[in-house]
C-alpha cells in the first residue's frame, strides 16, 4: 500500500527496514540514514485503475462502503493514469456532502453506472 500511496503522491518511494537481510533485498537500493540501513521500495503507478464506490457524482466525487473501500480504493484511484470507477448509485451534483467525499473528482476520469 505504501508503494501505491507514493505513486499517487508523486514520491519516488518509501524507505523500510522490512526485508533487510532476506532475499527481498536482492537487487534493491540500500540507503543509509543517520547510520541506519534501509531498503528503497520504489513507487508503484498504474496505467489503468478500476475501482468500485458506493456513490459517485457527475464530477467524480466518491464515497465508499466498509473499511476496505476506504483503505484501498482512494490509493488506487490516485496512482493511475486512467482511473475508472463503477458506482452503486450515481448522485446529482451536490447530493454528496463535501465532508463525506473520500476521493475527490480530480482523480477520477470515467464513471460507470
What does each model-identified segment do?
Residues 1-113:
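Conserved alpha/beta enzyme-core scaffold
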